[in-house]
Amino acid sequence: MEELLTIAFRTVVLYFVILVIFRFMGKREIGELSILDLVVFIMMAEIAVLAIENVDDHLFHTILPMLVLMIIQVTLAYFSLKNRKVRQLLDGKPTIIIKYGKIDEEAMKSQRYNFDDLMVQLRENSIDRVADVSFAILEPSGKLTIVKKENSGEHRQLEMPLIIDGFIQTENLSRISKDRKWLLESLQKHGYTNPSDISFCSFTDGEIYIDEKDGHRT
């Protein structure tokens, strides 16, 4: 009986400890968890199970590694927020699977993504024909984001990020047949001289959108 009460007590304590730790780690939908999140969650679950089973082991021996995991996750999340390269390393980056109704088989192979997966996710988005898709983007979470054709049958343009967190996205500039010089000239027309002052800048349908960083002029 005493052992059962101990198990119940440890279960309740660890439940609230994990709850607090997850709260500090930030909010995220289950479908949007990164590999880092999954690794941390799985390790915490294993540690908790071992702690509940080994009633003779001190709870501190369980809580300490959980706190260490939390510190690792929060630290990496901070650097991921500040640095896009770190973010891409930890979370991966989106991959264009369909462009203007044409499937990119090489992109699918690189992501180990097969045609069955593609057709399932198209059907889930009420898409019957690949030709009706302007863009299909495989997100790091595994979700397929779809941009449909216009009602007129014309393909829609994908919003292309040109600046993220103050850093120019050279690869995306080449995708729209533009260069760094063109971008800097466009920014100057809008009154910006330094890309580092810009939080996000994108290009779509011939128009440029600019969102400056907090604390800069409006």
Swiss-Prot record:
This is UPF0702 transmembrane protein YrbG. One of its GO terms (cellular component) is plasma membrane. Gene3D superfamilies: bsu07140 like domains. It is a multi-pass membrane protein. It is found in: Cell membrane. Belongs to the UPF0702 family. The keyword Chloroplast does not apply. Pfam families: DUF421 (PF04239). InterPro entries: DUF421 (IPR007353), UPF0702_alpha/beta_dom_sf (IPR023090). The chain crosses the membrane at residues 4-24, 32-52, 59-79. It comes from the Bacteria. The keyword Cell membrane applies. Keywords: Cell membrane, Membrane, Transmembrane, Transmembrane helix. It comes from Bacillus subtilis (strain 168). The gene is yrbG.
